């Protein structure tokens, strides 16, 4: 589970501790994504849904958000919490796109949230210029920064019980989304090339007396036309 998502889960679990909220965790991915949901169970989540279907394969952020929004339409909820972004694509698009698909208000880059009664929340949003305190009504979608909190550790008992709980696997037939909006067919983004950044060679290590070291540094700086 990536750091932003884990902070988002912790924020949801804090609502559970304080107000008795029911926490449902959703992920979309291949079979091994089941491990992430088991981790969420071990931390304290109540329900886990794994979106997995060949029709979801090849999805970009738009198709991914369409699938998750389709699953959310089948559920009752007051608040949707996502991490700010994944650690692979780093687009920070899925959370806001989910909100758009569902027609819900959204607040991104959260570092704090407070329940004000009724259907009102006060949230602390990070910006490059500082922080904003905003009021938002539920249902809504928020995206969370990893710096928002310190996620709880999984207990031994929680880990053991996590493997006794059922992860629900949902496919295309379980969500209310047109097939043309899912997977590769529903993805306007196309990857033409991917590559691995080349590793840098290791630097040289010199063991010299201080005076010799100083002379060598000056020599190298002159070679680079720095001095």
Residue positions per predicted region:
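N-terminal glycine-rich FAD/FM-binding segment characteristic of electron-transfer flavoproteins
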Residues: 1-227
